[in-house]
Design a protein with these regions (language model features):
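Residue-level detector of conserved, function-critical positions
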Residues: 1-104
Length: 104
């Protein structure tokens, strides 16, 4: 497995299918779900990407921020993140998963 250390988690890559997850300091997987990519945490959330290239956020308890998956998202900055929905709408999302601003 390839590993990269950042914060209190270690990113690991499963060799059989090249999927990523995070391992906690006590050796437990952060999420039951494996992802095509997991970024580092910014303001308590890491960007995750699925096989279909859609993105979301995962928190430090392994919970996805939103039920909706997005075309792309940026890291959180000052409590908000910017992204684009699959229908082309741009948005801002807060740390509770609430879509605050939507525009085309």
């Amino acid at each position: 497995m390839e590993t990269a250390q950042k914060e209190e988690f270690t990113r690991v890559q499963r060799v059989s299918d090249n999927k990523y997850n995070l391992i906690t300091a006590d050796g437990k997987l952060l999420s039951k779900q494996w992802f095509d990519w997991i970024d580092y945490f910014h303001e308590g959330f890491a960007i995750v990407r699925r096989e279909d290239y859609l993105t979301n956020f995962i928190d430090k308890q392994g919970k996805l921020l939103s039920e909706e998956w997005f075309s792309w998202v940026n890291d959180f900055k000052d409590g908000l993140a910017v992204g684009q929905r699959t229908n082309g709408e741009y948005f801002k999302i807060d740390k509770q998963g609430k879509i605050l601003v939507v525009s085309e």
